[in-house]
């Protein structure tokens, strides 16, 4: 097979070529096809400037020659081969390196502020330029996770979860730059490793080393909940903790080992991952289990994309796996992304791109994936000098990662803002 018939198509109207079959060499690779498209565009518009393109055949990126790809994917050449082309994704550009005093366990950012949690028992708020704005101190042990509850003008509400078995709810006024502990959420009997705020921003869920999930109110009030602790003098309790005591609205039990990651799929449905090799879906209204996805190894992290309705998981066997959480077959993995050489400790879907996600690992590397190219990542972000422990991805195209080198790196990734529909 020396030549084959191909038709090129794209969703980007700026780069449309004639919708007719072309005869092209079967041995063509990405650079050859990119040259063909650019020549066709030049013929239509003399002022066309060269653009690097990527190509998809049957929804998979071309990473070899066309004939090899067609053979591997078992595609017939009897008919015209349909080839989609998209503008090549440029590499994320490094922006800031923000030094911390200890390991960075967690990060959550928006368009204005970055919130990090650290093994030095504090959380910190940073500007996008890497300026330290506020240190949030009050825990007696390592901060394991952080989350923004809401950002309302000058007043923000945030959460910190800790190895000290508590979650603290804070109010921060950015104009006065004052932070106040409003509530100390108590009820877990082990390290609180993961927290997630619901879509209404009125509740949050926590997951713990004690195998339990708990749902709490995320609304600051002036009320203190009573807590049953017969062996603890009340006076001592008052002086030890910051903020009013808050107890959970509901406890969800079912996991047999530590809960490592939790998220809300919508206002009524929770998803949790555990060291017991399962991912479980829960009814957040009743607290009942809805379904279980079973794996063969410990799950460290999960992320859900409402755009593609897929769940991504990271495990101790170095694989990132994609699941359909609605599937009746609870062990069906849709796709495995295999490139890391250590435990996968962080996964995060792109907020504005249904095919892209990042993963971080104990191998010190952050990888940017496109699910249409599952055999290799789009890019390796290899700035860290030690274990990667957390990652985030903001609506405005910032990728962040933190780790055991005490550094938070930020990268600007324009492709997922401008090319959200690719």
UniProtKB/Swiss-Prot annotation:
Q: Name one GO biological process term.
A: regulation of cell cycle
- UniProt-annotated stretches for the region Ubiquitin-like (UBL) domain: 4-87
Q: What Pfam families does this protein map onto? A: NLE, WD40
Q: Which UniProt keywords apply?
A: Nucleus, Repeat, Ribosome biogenesis, rRNA processing, WD repeat
Cellular component terms per the entry's GO annotation: nucleolus; nucleoplasm; PeBoW complex; preribosome, large subunit precursor
Task: Kindly give the InterPro entries that the UniProt entry links to this protein.
Answer: G-protein_beta_WD-40_rep, NLE, WD40/YVTN_repeat-like_dom_sf, WD40_repeat_CS, WD40_repeat_dom_sf, WD40_rpt, WDR12/Ytm1
- Give one GO molecular function term: ribonucleoprotein complex binding
* Entry-linked PROSITE patterns: WD_REPEATS_1, WD_REPEATS_2, WD_REPEATS_REGION
Q: Where are the WD repeats?
A: 99-136, 138-180, 187-226, 254-292, 294-333, 339-379, 383-421
Domain of life, per lineage: Eukaryota
| Region (Disordered), start-end ranges | 220-243
Q: Where in the cell is it found?
A: Nucleus, Nucleolus; Nucleus, Nucleoplasm
**Similarity comment:** Belongs to the WD repeat WDR12/YTM1 family.
Complex and partners: Component of the PeBoW complex, composed of bop1, pes1 and wdr12. The complex is held together by bop1, which interacts with pes1 via its N-terminal domain and with wdr12 via a high-affinity interaction between the seven-bladed beta-propeller domains of the 2 proteins. The PeBoW complex associates with the 66S pre-ribosome. Interacts (via UBL domain) with mdn1 (via VWFA/MIDAS domain).
Which purpose does this protein serve, as stated in its record?
A: Component of the PeBoW complex, which is required for maturation of 28S and 5.8S ribosomal RNAs and formation of the 60S ribosome.
Q: What is this protein called?
A: Ribosome biogenesis protein wdr12
Give the species.
Danio rerio
Q: What gene is this protein a product of?
A: wdr12
